[in-house]
UniProtKB/Swiss-Prot annotation:
Binds directly to 23S rRNA. The L1 stalk is quite mobile in the ribosome, and is involved in E site tRNA release. Signal peptide: none annotated. GO terms for cellular component: large ribosomal subunit. The keyword Ribosomal protein applies. Pfam families: Ribosomal_L1. The lineage of its organism: Bacteria, Bacillati, Actinomycetota, Actinomycetes, Propionibacteriales. Belongs to the universal ribosomal protein uL1 family. This is Large ribosomal subunit protein uL1. InterPro entries: Ribosom_uL1_bac-type, Ribosomal_uL1, Ribosomal_uL1-like, Ribosomal_uL1/biogenesis, Ribosomal_uL1_3-a/b-sand, Ribosomal_uL1_CS. Part of the 50S ribosomal subunit. Keywords: Repressor, Ribonucleoprotein, Ribosomal protein, RNA-binding, rRNA-binding, Translation regulation, tRNA-binding.
């Protein structure tokens, strides 16, 4: 793949084979962000699990302490008082049967989906539309719940969802390049703690095999998964 001059210069500014402390990797990623837009800071983790086995599927959510820097558009499938509660909590789109039909027809102008338990019998038919996009509501991630107001507030406040893919990789964001180094580091630490907590009992050997952090258009910097998770304390000179 042909890389831009900016990308090549950024890739040459650090040792691609070195395993950096999380905060050091974040600093490099921020420095490599030269685009005119506010790039997202992404993390990819390669896990020592077999996603083909149900008991090794790693999936969860975490509330990032400093949010994501993005305003998520939240859709809620609910009726009556639950629908009103969702609207009051800031849901962007709320509805029942008609909204289900609209989504089934291909409308996908939203970033997250929440549903009340009584709606799931009907929402279930959207599996082929929402599932491949990681948008299908699920009790395990708190998106199938009677407390739709809390679910909406959590998502709007910076809650992210992650799920291991068929190659055993986890992808998630920890904020924007405009965030301070410590903000990004603390978001990273929160996500890492949750991934570690979700380690399957049947997973043998090394659980986290590789971690990289990068901006949207920047090169990946390898992070040492064994370094301290209290990343904000790694460098007293870090920018908050």
């Amino acid at each position: 793949m042909q890389r831009s001059k900016t990308y090549r210069a950024a890739a040459e500014s650090f040792d691609k084979d070195e395993l950096y402390a999380p905060l050091a990797a974040i600093k490099i990623a921020k420095t490599s962000s030269k685009k005119k837009f506010d790039e997202t800071v992404d993390v990819v983790m390669r896990l020592g699990v077999d996603p083909r086995k149900a008991d090794q599927m790693v999936r969860g959510t975490v509330n990032l302490p400093h949010g994501t820097g993005k305003t998520a558009r939240v859709l809620v499938f609910a009726n009556a008082d639950k629908a009103e509660a969702a609207r009051e909590a800031g849901a962007d789109v709320v509805g029942g049967d008609e909204l289900i039909d609209k989504v089934a027809g291909g409308w996908l102008d939203f970033d997250a989906v929440v549903a009340t338990p009584d709606m799931m019998g009907k929402v279930g038919r959207l599996g082929r539309v929402l599932g491949p996009r990681g948008l299908m509501p699920n009790p395990k991630t708190g998106t199938v719940t009677p407390d739709v107001a809390k679910a909406v507030s959590d998502i709007k406040g910076g809650k992210i969802e992650f799920r291991v893919d068929r190659h055993a990789n986890l992808h998630f964001i920890i904020g924007k390049a405009s965030f301070g180094e410590v903000q990004l580091a603390e978001n990273y630490a929160a996500a890492l703690e949750e991934v570690l907590r979700l380690k399957p009992a049947s997973s043998k050997g090394r659980y986290i095999k590789k971690i990289t952090v990068s901006t949207t258009m920047g090169p990946g910097i390898q992070v040492d998964p064994n370094r301290t998770r209290n990343v904000a304390l790694e460098d007293e000179n870090a920018q908050p």
